[in-house]
Amino acid sequence: MIGKKSFQTNVYRMSKFDTYIFNNLYINDYKMFWIDSGIAKLIDKNCLVSYEINSSSIILLKKNSIQRFSLTSLSDENINVSVITISDSFIRSLKSYILGDLMIRNLYSENKDLLLWNCEHNDIAVLSEVVNGFREINYSDEFLKVFFSGFFSKVEKKYNSIFITDDLDAMEKISCLVKSDITRNWRWADICGELRTNRMILKKELESRGVKFRELINSIRISYSISLMKTGEFKIKQIAYQSGFASVSYFSTVFKSTMNVAPSEYLFMLTGVAEK
C-alpha cells in the first residue's frame, strides 16, 4: 500500500471480452476506476447493474459492495483500466474537507453501492496524473485529503453522480436477483436484505402491476426451466430441482398452470423425445 497504507494502485490491460473481477480482498475499502479508451460494461453479479462506461466515466465502488462487481471490455482494441483501492479510514477522514452536503450524503450513504460520474477528459487527466505520481512522489496525508475531497466535491457539483442501481424497477430487480441464485428459497426478507429496501415499497410496486410475489418467483423459475428443456440434456426431475422447485409434483402443477401443458409434453414438443 502507498501513502501510509491508504492507497493501492493498479493498471490492468484488457482485450475484448476480457473480464476483471473486483475481488473480496478489500471489501471494507473503496475502489475507484476508469478506462483510458473504448467502452466496457460494469456488471453486478446479482444483475442489479449492467451499465456501459467509456473513457469519460469515473466509478467509485463503495465498501462492502466491491465483491459483487466485474468489468468486461467491449472494445475491439485493448484498453487499460486504472484502479485505486482507497481505505475506509481515509474516506472517513474526508468528511470535514468535502464541500457540499449532497456529496457528503452520497459518499457516506449506505443505500448506494456506487457513484458514477461522466466527466470531461481534463478532470480525469488531473486524477491520473496524481495517481501515477504515487510511485515516485511521497504525497503528504494533508495533500491527499485536500486533493480527493476537492476532486469529489468538484465532479459532484459539475456532473452529478448517477445512481445506476436506480434504473431498474422492482420487478426487474427481483427478477435479476432470483436468477442469480435460482435454487435459493427466496423469501421477502431475503429480497429486501439483498436490495437494501423496505418490503412495503417493493410490495406496493408489485401490487400496482397486479403481480404477487410468489407468482413472480415461480414465473422466473418456469422461464428458467424452459431454457433447460431447450438444451435437451435434462430429465423433468433434474429440471424441477435445478429450477428451484421443492418437488417435481409442485413444479408440474405450476408449469401446467403457466403453460397450459404438462412439462413432459412441453419437453416432447421441444425435443421430439418422450421421457420414459
From Swiss-Prot:
Alphabetical keyword list: Activator, Cytoplasm, DNA-binding, Transcription, Transcription regulation, Virulence
Signal peptide range in chain numbering: none
Cellular location(s): Cytoplasm
Chief place where the protein resides: cytoplasm
GO biological process, one term: positive regulation of DNA-templated transcription
InterPro entries xref list: Homeodomain-like_sf, HTH_AraC, HTH_AraC-typ_CS, ToxT_HTH1, ToxT_N, Tscrpt_reg_AraC-type_HTH
PROSITE patterns according to UniProt: HTH_ARAC_FAMILY_1, HTH_ARAC_FAMILY_2
A molecular function (GO) term: transcription cis-regulatory region binding
Domain HTH araC/xylS-type: 172-269
DNA-binding region of this protein: 189-210, 236-259
Stored Gene3D superfamilies: 2.60.120.810, Homeodomain-like, ToxT, HTH1 motif
GO CC annotation, single: cytoplasm
Protein's UniProt keywords contain DNA-binding: yes
Purpose: Probable regulatory protein for the tcp operon.
Official protein name in the record: TCP pilus virulence regulatory protein
Gene it is expressed from: tcpN
